[in-house]
Amino acid sequence: MILNGKTRAGKPGFPWLVFLHGFSGDSREWQDVGAQLPDYPQLHLDLPGHGDSANIAVAGFDEVSQLLADTLVSYNILKFWLVGYSLGGRIAMFHACQHPAGLIGLIVEGGHPGLHDEPTRKARAESDAQWAERFRREPLENVFSAWYQQPVFAALQETERDALVALRSQNNGAALGAMLQATSLAQQPDLRAALRAHDYPFHYVYGEHDDKFGAIATELTAQRHVIPNAGHNAHRENPAAVAACLAQILRLRIKDIP
């Protein structure tokens, strides 16, 4: 079994960019950014429970990571950068910590490396279980209206929030609920130590108004990049700036590729 996705052709010899979306997104999420990086072949994936992979269920991070590995093999992707946002960033970090063959670098936007202590982990598990139940039982428009009122999304304008609610409500609620619990931050190991031992370029991107993940960025041994005029969803709020940031990162590294 492999994940569904969409490819974009690039120039021969350039490494692949493998894009992973956030919770309730799909393979379209990074398309505006990817369109501004035409030299690079790209794979935009639908994660389990999302988009055309909505019928794929996983039990946890190990299974997602194996699915990702199998998918890359199926596309014969031998050298690649992982680029992930939020949930996709957490999956990207977890996968990178498994030392996959062919990984050139890691770019994470607003992804959490993991929780430190058991009380926080328990509280998060309870919160995610409640959200998952809502996704399974309530109209998605109602759930996402509440979801985007969370403090991390405070920088969103009302029109942006309404657009996201309408877009995300096209999902399958049961599939989202299952994926939310399977990949809950409560289930994710604390990846800080493993990420400190990385032997690949690690870049962390966040919006200037995203105070929570700006603080998290300081805890990581990653090169930090602040996106102006953006909050937690920087690649949607300011795609041109995120694309320019990625282009700069990739230009600096392309000369190092054998």
Curated annotation (Swiss-Prot):
<comment type="pathway">
    <text>Quinol/quinone metabolism; 1,4-dihydroxy-2-naphthoate biosynthesis; 1,4-dihydroxy-2-naphthoate from chorismate: step 3/7.</text>
</comment>
<dbReference type="Pfam" id="PF00561">
    <property type="entry name" value="Abhydrolase_1"/>
</dbReference>
<dbReference type="InterPro" id="IPR029058">
    <property type="entry name" value="AB_hydrolase_fold"/>
</dbReference>
<comment type="function">
    <text>Catalyzes a proton abstraction reaction that results in 2,5-elimination of pyruvate from 2-succinyl-5-enolpyruvyl-6-hydroxy-3-cyclohexene-1-carboxylate (SEPHCHC) and the formation of 2-succinyl-6-hydroxy-2,4-cyclohexadiene-1-carboxylate (SHCHC).</text>
</comment>
<dbReference type="InterPro" id="IPR000073">
    <property type="entry name" value="AB_hydrolase_1"/>
</dbReference>
<protein>
    <recommendedName>
        <fullName>2-succinyl-6-hydroxy-2,4-cyclohexadiene-1-carboxylate synthase</fullName>
        <ecNumber>4.2.99.20</ecNumber>
    </recommendedName>
</protein>
<dbReference type="GO" id="GO:0070205">
    <property type="term" value="F:2-succinyl-6-hydroxy-2,4-cyclohexadiene-1-carboxylate synthase activity"/>
</dbReference>
<dbReference type="GO" id="GO:0009234">
    <property type="term" value="P:menaquinone biosynthetic process"/>
</dbReference>
<keyword id="KW-0474">Menaquinone biosynthesis</keyword>
<dbReference type="InterPro" id="IPR022485">
    <property type="entry name" value="SHCHC_synthase_MenH"/>
</dbReference>
<comment type="subunit">
    <text>Monomer.</text>
</comment>
<comment type="pathway">
    <text>Quinol/quinone metabolism; menaquinone biosynthesis.</text>
</comment>
<comment type="similarity">
    <text>Belongs to the AB hydrolase superfamily. MenH family.</text>
</comment>
<keyword id="KW-0456">Lyase</keyword>
